[in-house]
A protein has these predicted regions:
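A structured, charge-rich N-terminal accessory region that forms the first stable segment of a protein
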Residues: 1-114, 119-125, 129, 198-199, ...
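Aromatic-residue detector
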Residues: 25, 37-38, 131, 138-139, ...
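Short alpha-helical "patches" and their helix-cap loops
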Residues: 37-45, 135, 157-163
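A structural signal for short, well-ordered beta-strand segments and their strand-loop junctions
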Residues: 38-39, 117-120, 142-144, 153-156
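Catalytic micro-motifs at enzyme active sites that drive phosphoryl/nucleotidyl and oxygen chemistry
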Residues: 104-108, 126-134, 139-144, 162-166
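Residues immediately within or flanking Cys/His clusters that coordinate Zn2+
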Residues: 115-118, 137-140, 151, 173
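Domain-exit/linker segments immediately C-terminal to small folded modules
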Residues: 144, 148-240
Length: 240
């Protein structure tokens, strides 16, 4: 007689504005295992931690995740980059580099860039430390709430933030997985670039209102961001 399939569930709730990979990592730590073990339980030998999971998974793997999750389909989808990128690039292709999304430079479980954090956000007493979706977006350089610059590397050892290497010994996403430094102890950097912050605020406004303005004329969100990219490319060319 065959044994019935064991039922188990991810009970960790997705936090406000949390990104998909952060939720999976915290879910693994909450049940007492590494992200690698949880990923294998969900999807077998698929090397999910060697890619940019925040871009999403295919329908079959998404269904497998839903069958073991207490979260709704909509809430999980909202934690993926597609929930933002689809507004500025309708022909969204998760297999390609996406404009405005910081590339992780992934190799095995390591990433050479793309993970930014606000150290004050990690200190919240109301929620466990978690990574925000908007920290992966290219125009985000500062935390508006705390008026701090985001950091993308450990101030102690200088290595880029590597959340996929989190394990039980680290306990949460606020710990550098390379040297063990608690990022919540980092001295805040208040040296904010005001021009960059102004652009960040304007981009957020366009994204929220789903309309922008160029030369005093209304344009779609997609067109506004295309124009912004063109101007930024021109500025970089002139500076270099």
């Amino acid at each position: 007689m065959s044994q019935p399939e064991q039922c188990w569930y991810i009970r960790t709730p997705i936090q406000q504005g949390e990104i998909f990979s952060s939720w999976l990592i915290r879910s693994a730590l909450d049940v007492g295992c590494s992200p690698m073990v949880l990923i294998e339980a969900l999807w077998g030998k698929w090397r999910a931690l060697t890619i940019d999971l925040d871009k999403g998974v295919d329908a079959e793997r998404f269904d497998a995740l839903l069958s073991h999750s207490m979260e709704s389909k909509q809430k999980i989808q909202q934690s993926m980059l597609s929930s933002v990128v689809s507004q500025i690039q309708p022909n969204y292709d998760s297999n390609q580099n996406i404009p405005w999304v910081l590339s992780l430079g992934t190799r095995n479980r390591s990433n050479t860039s793309g993970r930014q954090v606000c150290v004050e956000c990690l200190k919240s007493h109301e929620n466990p430390p978690y990574l925000r979706l908007m920290w992966r977006i290219g125009w985000h350089c500062s935390c508006v709430e705390h008026q701090l610059s985001l950091i993308d590397h450990c101030p102690e050892c200088g290595v880029t933030i590597q959340p996929f290497k989190a394990d039980m010994e680290h306990g949460c996403l606020a710990i550098c997985t390379t040297c063990g430094f608690d990022l919540r102890r980092c001295e805040e950097s208040k040296n904010i670039n005001l021009n960059a912050l102004n652009f960040q605020n304007k981009a957020e406004q366009v994204l929220k209102q789903k309309i922008g303005f160029y030369n005093q004329s209304p344009v779609t969100t997609q067109v506004w961001f295309e124009i912004a990219r063109s101007w930024l490319s021109e500025i970089r060319f002139l500076v270099n």
